[in-house]
Each structure stands twice: as structure tokens, then as C-alpha cells.
Design a protein with these regions (language model features):
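Short, low-complexity disordered leader/linker segments with a strong preference
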Residues: 1-60, 134-141, 340-344
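Hinge/cleft segment of the Venus flytrap/periplasmic-binding protein
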Residues: 51, 57-59, 189, 193-197, ...
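Hydrophobic alpha-helical segments within soluble ligand-binding/sensing domains
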Residues: 57, 61, 104, 160-185, ...
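Extracytoplasmic "Venus flytrap"
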Residues: 60-88, 94-110, 122-127, 190-200, ...
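Short, solvent-exposed amphipathic alpha-helices that sit
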Residues: 72-91, 168-172, 196-215, 229, ...
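Short beta-strand elements at the ligand-binding edges of bilobed clamshell
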Residues: 95-97, 152-175, 188-190, 220, ...
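Hydrophobic alpha-helical
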Residues: 105, 112-138, 205, 219, ...
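Flexible loop/hinge segments that line or gate small-molecule binding clefts
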Residues: 127-167, 282-291
Length: 344
């Protein structure tokens, strides 16, 4: 399989270099998959040769991901990858997990030495990947990004199957603005700094606060996706006596930790209460909290990218970028069907 891939890589790279990766915002005439099937929009069409298992050899893939214990989203994402990249489906898969960019890059170098056919990467951080991707290119190894974008030339990877994190953040901020508060005092709990999820979700809020005189950030601090750390951050703000009426947490786990601190201090939260709660990912348990009125808004982040990667490997990259279709949910309008259909 390795020799076969090396024969194909030249034409693949020529095709990939012919097209710039499209911006994550906007649909550009893209099609959408049914909502029950991890929906996606696609942009920037480009053809690439398909891989095959006709020789009887397994396709060797090195999969670099964030820690599955990071969040419910990541657990679902890892499960999806493991259920797809199996021997029965034609793959020999090796997995590496870390929340640190430098560890992930070192793992990529090791996978290159192991002569994998494909590197599948969900990057912990957006920067620093050019060198190792150049190494992969020289070795004839194809790279597919999933879940998160990186700052690297598009000719260094075959395709990108990602969430539009900036759009997720903008949808949440637009919803918050629509609530018509006279004053917004926001406690902002961030994810791992430098990740595309943090950059996108933080960026929308930062821009709104800069533009509006009645929007204020009371506290902005990373909890690195941790429920426990988020609880500690909120508890410290409560203890300081600083007033806030919005918690903008960049994932569900951190929102859960924030709510635990509010409950401990007997501060009401949710629909019609003292503090608005915003989370991201749409874990099933979080959507149930939303439906119960304990939270106010949850932004979807779709973790089911594996089938798109499998299709690209076996049938060729028909587009450079696949953007997962995602929406936000309001406690006042979410239904039991939404919880069942979109909860992860």
C-alpha cells in the first residue's frame, strides 16, 4: 500500500494546489447532508485519486487527536473514528492523544517514520505544523485534517473536514444580543488557548464587547475545557463580589462546572433567572438541562467526521473543505426530538 500511495501522491498534490481552501463562512452553493447523518456543507471542489484495498493490504493510518477525556464531544469524536478505521473496513489504525501541540507534532513525526499511508490530524493548536506536514509531503504521506483547522498552506494536506468555529461563536453571540439585556456583564470561560475552537468562539464575543458600550467582560480566563477548573474560576469571581449576568463557556463541561458554582452560592440561572448560561457541543445531558430551562443556549459542534474521511480516502477528495453543518439551540424552543436527534 505504501508504494501504491507514493505513486499517486504527485497527482494528488497537483490537484490540491490548484485550489485555495475556501473560507469557513458562507455556503458557496454547497450541498447539505440530512441532519440525522452528521450534516455537512462542502466547498472548494477539487479532485484527488482514490486509495484502494484491491491489493489486499490494509491502508495504514496514523490518527492524532485530542484527549478523549477532554469532553463529551471528544469522546464521541474518538468513538466515531475508532468505529470507522477498523481492519474490517480496510484499515490498520494507530491512535495518539494529547492536548499539547508539541506532543502531537512529535507523534506525527513518528508516524512518518513508521511509513503510514495517511496522517489524520485534529490539531491541539493552529500553529507550528508546517515543518512536519512538509516532511509528510516529501515522504508521500497524505494528510487529512479533521475537527479543527490549522495555519498552514493548503497544498500540505489532502482535505479538511472541520467545524466552522467562528460561525459557532457568532451564532451564540447573535442569540445573546437578541435577548435585549440593558447591560451584559459576561463571565467568559475559554477553552485551550490557541485551539481553533477557542479562537473562533472567543473571537465573536471579543468583537461584540469591543463594539458595544453596554457589553463588558467581567472575567476572561481559560479552564482548558475542564469542568473542575471552570467551577473554581466562577467560584473565585463570586467570592470577589463582582457582578455578572452571563456565563459564556466554550464547551458544555465548563458550563456544567460554572453552574455547579452558581448552585453552591444559591445564584439562580437559566430561563428567566439571574444568570444566562451558554455552552457548546450539544451533549445529550446538556440539551436536557437546556430543555429543563436550567441553561439558555447550547451551540452544536458536530463530532461525526469519520465517514467523510473514509470516503475521501477510498473515493477521492471531491472537495478541499467539508464544513460540518451545525446550529444553536434555545431553551425556549428546543424539543424532545431535538434532544434525541442532536445530543451526543
Amino acid at each position: 500500500m505504501k508504494k501504491f500511495v507514493k505513486m499517486l501522491v504527485s497527482s494528488a498534490l497537483v490537484a490540491a494546489m490548484a485550489f485555495g481552501m475556501c473560507a469557513c463562512n458562507g455556503n458557496g452553493g454547497a450541498t447539505q447532508a440530512p441532519a440525522t447523518e452528521a450534516p455537512a456543507t462542502t466547498e472548494g471542489a477539487t479532485e484527488a485519486p482514490a486509495d484502494t484495498t484491491a491489493s489486499g493490504e490494509l491502508i495504514k493510518v496514523g490518527i492524532i487527536n485530542n484527549d478523549p477525556n477532554e469532553s463529551g464531544y471528544r469522546t464521541a469524536n474518538d468513538k466515531d473514528m475508532k468505529e470507522t478505521f477498523t481492519k474490517e473496513n480496510g484499515y490498520e489504525a494507530s491512535f495518539f492523544y494529547s492536548l499539547k501541540n508539541e506532543d502531537q507534532i512529535a507523534a506525527a513525526q513518528k508516524f512518518i517514520q513508521d511509513e503510514v499511508d495517511y496522517l489524520l490530524i485534529s490539531a491541539a493548536g493552529t500553529s507550528g505544523w508546517d515543518g512536519v506536514l512538509e516532511q509528510a509531503k516529501k515522504a508521500g504521506i497524505k494528510v487529512i485534517l479533521f475537527d479543527r483547522t490549522i495555519d498552514a498552506s493548503e497544498d500540505l494536506y489532502e482535505a479538511s473536514i472541520v467545524s466552522d468555529m467562528a460561525k459557532e461563536g457568532q451564532q451564540a453571540v447573535d442569540w445573546l444580543a437578541s435577548q435585549g439585556l440593558s447591560e451584559y456583564k459576561v463571565l467568559h470561560i475559554q477553552g485551550v488557548m490557541g485551539s481553533s475552537a477557542q479562537i473562533g468562539r472567543s473571537g465573536a464575543l471579543d468583537a461584540k464587547v469591543k463594539a458595544e458600550a453596554n457589553w463588558t467582560i467581567v472575567k476572561q480566563q481559560t479552564a482548558e475545557w475542564s469542568e473542575e477548573t471552570a467551577q473554581q474560576i466562577v467560584q473565585a469571581v463570586i467570592d470577589s463580589g463582582e457582578k455578572f449576568n452571563v456565563i459564556y463557556a466554550e464547551n458544555d463541561n465548563m458550563a456544567k462546572g460554572a453552574v455547579a458554582a452558581l448552585d453552591k452560592a444559591n445564584i439562580s440561572h437559566g430561563v428567566g433567572k439571574d444568570v444566562i448560561i451558554i455552552g457548546f457541543d450539544c451533549n445529550s445531558w446538556a440539551l436536557k438541562e437546556l430543555k429543563a430551562g436550567n441553561w439558555n443556549y447550547d451551540g452544536q459542534c458536530n463530532p461525526f467526521q469519520a465517514k467523510y474521511i473514509d470516503d475521501i480516502i477510498k473515493n477521492g477528495a471531491k472537495q478541499k473543505v467539508v464544513i460540518m453543518e451545525e446550529k444553536g439551540f434555545d431553551a425556549k424552543t428546543i424539543t424532545d426530538d431535538d434532544v434525541a436527534k442532536y445530543g451526543i
